[in-house]
């Protein structure tokens, strides 16, 4: 069973383009990504799954606990080699997300977490996901909420992001490709992270960003708090229950008719 808590430190470098397990300094971002895999893994149970843009591979391996088959796809050759060596349950392939190297109607689920904001042609990619899904297949996608991730900006703060989305824009992108959006959810800080926000001047995120921008040593308390974050510290809440525009990350569950 995949367990990043017990994994050796990743052999892949931390570039800012992807998160990796096993690093105390990266743990907040890793857990914020991992929670969506954990909470939505049941949608992959017994199914043929493509993770389009699998990165380090920890998520594809987590999905492999329940799926019939997991295909991982990434454009970076070093990443593909890493996943092949580290996660043998994942059928890892090298390829471009703009032209998915799979036949039409060949998988039941496409997973795309924290990737679409890196792509230049998002509409082309979403159309490709529609193509490779079987009728009734599910597209699971997560992405930073533009409203809270890059507030008041026309361009993303993260230099690796090409275009960030708000909830309405994500829904429009999916529906234009032919998907029916079953649900939209938001990732929020739970009670424990709200306490850490208060401890670190109102935002544990901003505290980490300021340290990185200043290229300053880690404050001992900040590092300890970041290293202690767990997936249970995040809430994944339907848009019907909480204002989606206040969320940290957006999660959409879309179905190919």
From Swiss-Prot:
The protein's name: Probable S-adenosylmethionine-dependent methyltransferase MSMEG_2350/MSMEI_2290
CDD domains attached to this UniProt entry: AdoMet_MTases
Gene Ontology biological process terms, A to Z: methylation
Disruption phenotype: Inactivation of this gene results in a dramatic reduction in the amounts of 6-O-methylglucosyl lipopolysaccharides (MGLP) synthesized and in the accumulation of precursors of these molecules. Cells lacking this gene do not grow at high temperature (42 degrees Celsius) in Sauton's medium, although their growth is comparable to that of wild-type at 30 and 37 degrees Celsius in this medium.
Species of the source: Mycolicibacterium smegmatis (strain ATCC 700084 / mc(2)155) (Mycobacterium smegmatis)
Family (UniProt): Belongs to the methyltransferase superfamily.
EC number(s) per entry: 2.1.1.-
The entry's keywords: Methyltransferase, S-adenosyl-L-methionine, Transferase
Protein function: Probable S-adenosylmethionine-dependent methyltransferase required for the 6-O-methylation of the polysaccharide backbone of 6-O-methylglucosyl lipopolysaccharides (MGLP).
Classification via Gene3D superfamilies: Vaccinia Virus protein VP39
